[in-house]
């Protein structure tokens, strides 16, 4: 629903004047009265970017929960920065020395909050690591998650939205968006246990399969995990009449990354410690071994086209890190930068409430007028607009027909 809300706002906000000129704009008022449920509220702002004039407003300063339209403010603020094109980085470093096929030192994986870091990228990073002349690590393997604070959810996020994948446990070390894709295929005979497979493959989680094929008495299909105790036993139960594919989040993302990283190093023949830890990369005496970079445009496209909450929060964290230059940044550090742009566009930040970067929080309150002013600003800045425009969702043909009618 939030994805479609963002899509609808962009469709209305960016329509050219020629489209609106075909209809009597004054009829929108009667349409609002006729279509909206009694006692409901709406705010509308329609602006012609080419002619630089407002075409229609209706309570455009009214505050409402923006849902995923909040992503516009986060994306535009991020793109407005002079360092906007810097990629998202995940790095591997080591200290100590390499002697006789052994690393006499520690390995560090430094997270840069890359929300697109997936299984193939993990393999690529490991392939770089194993080019170094050692097969034994006589030290520790650490994850460095010091980029942000330890809060894994945004302010105002609902605790019982977990284990939905749209609310992942955030960390500077994200792996496959902190989620597992579960594919379920019914068996050939009624009553058979369905086939269940998971991606990415990792021993970090376990699986319990209590499904039955074409068996309504088995109950409604369900995918969950023991999330109240932060467990990662994926539990698949109930009737499976047809093929299905679902996502479920995993607790917690940094540990999911590091566990899988060690597991795959072992699979490549590297002798590693039994466990991992978390600490900061030393300020000196360390050498970089490997690095993966994800372009900002890729992160932005997923953010806007798919209304990806994780990508929006990664952008917010990145804004905070770039603006402050410090470690352990908070969401508030990023929100301060968004509010600076709000003020620069002629609005009073005290008139609005921003709690996160993606709009998942129920504490956010924005207005149509503010959203349109952000779009106007983006349009006026060619560097910002070109990147933002590429990332916007494309109107499907059947929706175009609906608008034309």
Residue ranges of model-derived segments:
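A general secondary-structure junction signal
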Residues: 46-48, 94-96, 143-147, 280, ...
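Buried hydrophobic packing segments
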Residues: 74-79, 261, 315, 371-375
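Short active-site loop at a secondary-structure junction
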Residues: 57-77, 81
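Small-residue-rich helix-loop
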Residues: 34, 55-57, 306, 316-405
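Beta-lactamase-like hydrolase cores
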Residues: 21-62, 88, 123, 127-132
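Conserved serine DD-peptidase/penicillin-binding transpeptidase domain
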Residues: 30, 81-349
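Bacterial Sec-dependent N-terminal signal peptides
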Residues: 1-27
